[in-house]
Amino acid sequence: MATRRLTDAFLLLRNNSIQNRQLLAEQVSSHITSSPLHSRSIAAELDELADDRMALVSGISLDPEAAIGVTKRPPPKWVDGVDEIQYDVGRIKQKMKELASLHDKHLNRPTLDDSSEEEHAIEITTQEITQLFHRCQRAVQALPSRARACSEQEGRLLGNVVASLAQALQELSTSFRHAQSGYLKRMKNREERSQHFFDTSVPLMDDGDDNTLYHRGFTEDQLVLVEQNTLMVEEREREIRQIVQSISDLNEIFRDLGAMIVEQGTVLDRIDYNVEQSCIKTEDGLKQLHKAEQYQKKNRKMLVILILFVIIIVLIVVLVGVKSR
């Protein structure tokens, strides 16, 4: 199902309407103070300009419909929720850029020194992105509950907005999951390379066999390096487990968003089905109307024949009465 993202255009038009509203209010107030005798005519003109179709069809630059729209029809309650979700989506994109730079910096270090600060920053950023995804998911699911008393048009608009937000979150979660999978693969490749360079055929021994290991050619510095590499491998395994956990969380979010999109598509299919059924019923009603019209015409002919028959009988009775006298 092809969709278009109209959220940015909606926000731009809404901001322009607020500015135009202020300009029109200033002009109207100055005009009323300068000529109070014409206040009633100005109010009548504003009432005429309040119509949505007039505001859309006419080429008015000041958008007077928005000038009185606040007093008559405030924006729906779910608009604030949409703004919050869009703000969180922007934060997710920014955090994903920061996480990508941290991944590159952590994997492309020229030295073998372990940097716990970078790993801690990666962990915190990943957790923040996951929390933002969960919060956006809950906010998108809670949007329909804010539109219980809205009109049919606002309900359709809200359905399109929810579908658009769900699709945007699904795309972001997909890209984030691919980024995490790529980082995990690069980590595994680096571990394989490190094991290839640092692996030895000599088995690790207990503390009592250190002298034997020393006589085989290992120095104390090499033993310390082996211990450091062991600690580094354990740390990498912990990072890999965290990445796998974040990917599993993203899979849950991805499934929920996919279910929401499928649900919205089912609603749209149901609407299409109802429209088709209404068209079919309208055509059937039109056929029945034509049949009723034909029956009505036949009834008129029968009524005329019946009236003529009654007139003939009356005339015959009158004629018989006249002749009998």
From Swiss-Prot:
A biological process (GO) of this protein is: vesicle docking
Q: Which residues form the t-SNARE coiled-coil homology domain?
A: 230-292
Task: List the Vesicular topological domains.
Answer: 323-325
> Mind telling me which SMART domains this protein's record contains?
t_SNARE
Provide the transmembrane region boundaries: 302-322
Compartments (UniProt record): Golgi apparatus membrane
Gene3D superfamilies for the chain: 1.20.58.70
Q: How does it sit in the membrane?
A: Single-pass type IV membrane protein
Any one Pfam family match given in the protein's UniProt record, by short name? SNARE
A GO molecular-function descriptor:
SNAP receptor activity
Related illness = Pseudohypoparathyroidism 1B: A disorder characterized by end-organ resistance to parathyroid hormone, hypocalcemia and hyperphosphatemia. Patients affected with PHP1B lack developmental defects characteristic of Albright hereditary osteodystrophy, and typically show no other endocrine abnormalities besides resistance to PTH.
Record's function text? SNARE involved in vesicular transport from the late endosomes to the trans-Golgi network.
Protein name (Swiss-Prot/TrEMBL): Syntaxin-16
Q: Which organism is it from?
A: Homo sapiens
